[in-house]
Amino acid sequence: MDKILTVLTRGRLFLTVTLAMICILGDFLLTCATIISSNLRRALIDNGTHGLVGLLSWAVVVNPTLLPLGTLVREPFLWEILLCGVLSSLVDLDHFAAAGTVKLQNALSLKSRPPCHATTLIPVICLFLLLIVRLFKLQRIRRLPLILFVAWFSHHIRDAARRGLWLWPWGSTSPLPYWLYITLIVVIPYLVISLMNVTNYWTGPSVDSKHLPSVTGVQHV
């Protein structure tokens, strides 16, 4: 995986552009009259976009374009990508928990944001999870804290374009400018890549070097 993290390929650039376009497309759909006229359609589009953003964000980190399909399935890369997408979508379940009902209208009509939308919780929970993973030497899920961070923080950044970041207990920021929101969404995976490059703890020997493609002849951008 170390080679994946140190090479910027056309594949990773394509995934990055796709990530930005999914954000823009999802936001555009949420302005369409046929979507905003229905709470269900609006919720499905919004949550689906969150899921795709999480999925593509971790795909940028893993860069599956460098790996053969067999390695993707055999190793955890594909499942990590899917997990990041699912976790990013699941963040919105706290709307229903806070509303105390599964009725969509009630979940969308909360007077304040539910707990999982407090951005200050993200580093606390992710660091706690990292502590547990390291304390119990759970090597197979050692990247889970990073996956959760990407899924959760990308969800918050996307929401912040409309409502700002909720920095409990201090309050909320102003809504993020649209260009800043898109920039942050695109930058998050590369921040994670940089962090993973600091130490081999995140990568480790999970993939035998013979399964990794040679970087010879890879197109750089």
Listing of model-derived features with the role each one plays in the protein:
Residues 1-221:
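N-terminal membrane-targeting hydrophobic helices
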